[in-house]
Amino acid sequence: MKIKSVCELTGLTDRTIRRSIEEKLISPLYTENYLGRKNYNFSDRDIKDLNDIAVLRKFDFTLDEIKLVINDAETSKEILSNVKDRTAQTVLDSQNKLSVLSQINNEKAYTVAELAEELSKA
């Protein structure tokens, strides 16, 4: 299967798929023409791996973390804990921002300077 078909099948962009190859998250077979251009041939396994990687990325696993899990499933314990901690911190940060924003009158029009001043007071 060619890269365009994989994009359509997975919903991933060409760039995302190529990055997964560059980062050695997947290793599809390929042929190289005389100009050095690679023509990839993706297997069903490659597509499954891309879909799995996409799910992990949606939950903010980094490419380095995904590589570690690919190479050693035991690392998933620590990595999952790290992702949970990061997500909890993101939620806390968002709640703090919402609390500050809730204190500002949204019925009034503000300039950028006025809005920045109001936000910096909180």
For each predicted feature, which ranges?
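Arg/Lys-rich, alpha-helical DNA-contact motif
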Residues: 2-8, 41-122
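Major-groove DNA-recognition helix of helix-turn-helix-type DNA-binding domains
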Residues: 16-36
